[in-house]
C-alpha cells in the first residue's frame, strides 16, 4: 500500500520545470499522423539517457513504437503506460485541405506549436497526447530518483498512428495505416506482457475502462448521367436522374436516424458512460473538370460511433432500413472502416482502479471519479488492451489548457499507481555485472 511518505518522497523528485520543458520540447516536434519518426527518436533518446533501455518496434522504419522499461526486480504485476506520438492536424496537402478546412483553421498555430501562456500550456500536441506522455516518463524518472525500485515491470510506450489515418478508397496501403501499426503492433510484437494497462490521455483526472469504437460507412446513391442540353428537370429533386439532387433527401433521413440511433446507443456500466455520436465526414461525386453530363454516382461517408456492445452489422442493417424507408432510389451501404469498442471486466480491472484512486487521494486529496462521458465516447488505446483481455483504463491530467501543476500532479498519480501495482523492490536486487567470469573464477 502506498503511503503519504511515498507520496511526499516521489513528489519531491518531480521537477515541474523539467516536466514542462519536456512536454514543450516534445510537443513542438512536428508529428502529424504518418510523420511520427522525429518525435519517436526524441522519446527513444530521452529514455536511453535516463536508463530505461528503450527499443524500437515498428511495422515500418519511419513509424515505430518506442518501448522502455523500469523495474522488473522481483515478483510483481506489470503495468504498461501508453500514449500516442501523433496529433490531429490538417494534411498539409493543399489539394486535400482546401476541401475540409477554412483558411482561418489552416492558420491556427496550435495544430503544430506548443507554448506556455498565462500559466496554461497551449497547443494540441501537448493536449493530445504528448503532455500525458511526458507525465509517465517523468513518473518513472521520479521513482528512480527517489530510490523506489519496482518488483514488476513498468512499461513506458510511445506509439504512432492512434489518431490515424485509415486506408479508405484510393488512399490505401501502408502509408495510410494508423491504429494497426501503433498499440496493436506494440501488443503483438513489442515484447511486453502487461497485467494492466493505462492509456495516458487527458481525462481531467477521471478514469474510465470503457471505450467506443467506430465504423465509417459509404452510402452510395446511383443515378443516370444525362447530356446537359438533353436534360428535363422533374418537379421534385428526389426524382432527378442525377443522384446529387437526391443527397438532400438522404441527409434529412440520416439526420433523423442519427438522433434516434444516438439516444438508443447510450451505454453505462461501472467503468463509465459511453454516448457514441454520428456525423457525416465527406461527400464525393462527379469529376469537376469532366462536366457536361452530371454524374451517375455520389457517395456520402458517415462516421458512426460504436459502444462496447454494438457490432458493425447492427449499424449496416439499420442504415439500409433507413435508406429504403427514405425512398432515395438505388443505393448501396458498405463499411469501409470498422473498429469495435471494448470495456474492461469490472472485477479484473478493480485493482488498477483502486490503485489510481489511492494515488489520487494522496496526490490531490479527493477520490478518482469516473471520467466525463466524452472520454468514454471515443477511441483510445486502452481499447487495444481490453480487446486482448488485459484490464485497462484511460486516465490523465486536465485535457484542455493544462497547467504545469496539472502535469506534475498527473506524474505523481502515475508514479504512485505504478508503485502500488508493480510492488516495491530494492534497487540492489538487479543482476550484477555481465562478465562471463565470476569474481574468483579459478579459486586462487
Describe the predicted segments one by one:
Residues 82-84, 157-159, 198-201, 220, ...:
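Short beta-strand segments
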Residues 2-102, 299-301, 315:
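N-terminal helical capping/dimerization or prosegment-like subdomains
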Residues 123-212:
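Acidic/histidine-rich catalytic neighborhood of metal-dependent amide-processing enzymes
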Residues 78-80, 121, 195-199, 218:
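Short glycine-aspartate micro-motif
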Residues 90-116, 166-188, 270, 367, ...:
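Charged, glycine/proline-rich intrinsically disordered loops and linkers
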Residues 117, 139-157, 256-264, 421-429:
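Phosphate-handling active-site elements
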Amino acid at each position: 500500500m502506498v503511503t503519504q511518505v511515498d507520496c511526499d518522497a516521489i513528489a519531491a523528485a518531480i521537477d515541474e520545470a523539467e516536466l514542462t520543458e519536456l512536454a514543450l520540447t516534445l510537443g513542438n516536434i512536428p508529428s502529424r499522423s504518418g510523420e511520427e519518426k522525429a518525435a519517436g527518436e526524441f522519446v527513444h533518446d530521452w529514455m536511453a539517457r535516463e536508463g530505461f533501455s528503450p527499443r524500437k518496434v515498428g511495422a515500418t522504419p519511419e513509424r515505430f513504437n518506442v518501448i522502455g522499461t523500469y523495474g522488473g526486480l522481483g515478483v510483481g504485476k506489470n503495468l504498461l503506460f501508453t500514449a500516442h506520438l501523433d496529433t490531429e492536424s490538417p494534411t498539409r496537402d493543399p489539394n486535400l485541405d482546401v476541401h475540409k478546412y477554412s483558411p482561418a483553421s489552416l492558420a491556427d498555430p496550435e495544430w503544430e506549436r506548443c507554448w506556455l501562456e498565462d500559466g496554461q500550456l497551449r497547443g494540441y500536441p501537448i493536449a493530445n497526447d504528448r503532455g500525458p506522455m511526458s507525465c509517465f516518463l517523468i513518473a518513472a524518472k521520479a521513482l528512480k530518483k527517489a530510490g523506489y525500485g519496482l518488483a514488476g515491470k513498468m512499461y513506458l510506450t510511445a506509439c504512432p498512428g492512434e489518431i490515424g489515418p485509415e486506408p479508405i478508397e484510393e488512399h490505401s496501403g501502408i502509408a495510410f495505416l494508423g491504429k494497426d501499426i501503433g498499440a496493436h503492433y506494440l501488443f503483438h510484437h513489442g515484447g511486453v506482457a502487461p497485467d494492466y494497462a493505462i492509456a495516458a490521455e487527458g481525462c481531467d483526472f477521471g478514469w474510465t475502462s470503457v471505450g467506443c469504437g467506430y465504423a465509417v460507412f459509404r452510402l452510395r446513391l446511383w443515378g443516370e448521367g444525362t447530356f446537359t442540353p438533353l436534360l428535363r428537370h422533374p418537379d421534385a429533386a428526389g426524382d432527378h436522374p442525377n443522384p446529387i439532387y437526391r443527397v438532400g433527401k438522404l441527409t434529412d433521413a440520416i439526420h433523423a436516424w442519427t438522433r434516434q440511433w444516438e439516444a438508443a446507443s447510450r451505454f453505462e456500466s461501472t467503468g463509465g458512460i459511453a454516448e457514441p455520436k454520428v456525423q457525416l465526414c465527406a461527400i464525393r461525386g462527379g469529376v469537376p473538370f469532366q462536366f457536361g453530363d452530371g454524374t451517375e454516382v455520389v457517395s456520402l461517408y458517415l462516421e458512426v460511433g460504436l459502444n462496447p456492445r454494438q457490432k458493425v452489422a447492427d449499424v449496416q442493417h439499420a442504415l439500409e432500413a433507413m435508406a429504403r424507408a427514405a425512398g432515395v432510389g438505388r443505393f448501396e451501404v458498405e463499411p469501409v472502416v470498422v473498429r469495435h469498442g471494448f470495456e474492461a471486466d469490472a472485477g479484473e480491472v478493480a485493482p488498477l482502479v483502486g490503485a489510481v484512486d489511492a494515488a489520487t487521494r494522496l496526490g490531490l486529496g479527493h477520490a478518482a471519479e469516473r471520467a466525463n462521458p466524452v472520454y468514454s465516447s471515443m477511441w483510445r488505446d486502452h481499447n487495444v488492451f481490453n480487446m486482448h483481455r488485459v484490464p485497462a483504463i484511460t486516465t490523465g491530467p486536465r485535457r484542455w489548457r493544462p497547467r504545469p501543476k496539472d502535469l506534475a500532479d498527473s506524474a505523481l498519480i502515475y508514479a504512485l499507481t505504478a508503485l502500488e501495482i508493480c510492488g516495491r523492490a530494492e534497487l540492489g536486487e538487479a543482476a550484477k555485472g555481465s562478465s562471463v567470469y565470476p569474481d574468483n573464477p579459478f579459486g586462487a
